């Protein structure tokens, strides 16, 4: 498994980028500082309590709304290593990959994951393991080049390393 977390952060459908990081904070240039406001408009407990390595799980169309790399950036800055969702808004999906935050879509199976479940992820196989329920969910496998971009820490690092 690439990632394993005993605690997850569970969110519903249509969580938009304006909720992930409200526009009123976008003047803050440092992503670690900006991350202190992550999810503030939907979950005031997230930013002060999330621990590095804890996984985020969401419903349909996660990251819809404005095209801003700040949204996946603040989630990554808080130490979330991967986001699992029913589906992602396409621009959020690409922005997440471009900054080195892996995302995996598992469709309706996401409804089997409850807030208290321990979760594991094997990115290369596109599998999410529900360690609490002893179940596994086949997600969309990411093409190898996308896995390589995420592993490099994002598109910029990937391009630098290809020299």
Residue ranges and their predicted role:
Residues 3, 55, 143-145:
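Short hydrophobic "helix-edge" motifs at membrane interfaces and signal-peptide entry regions
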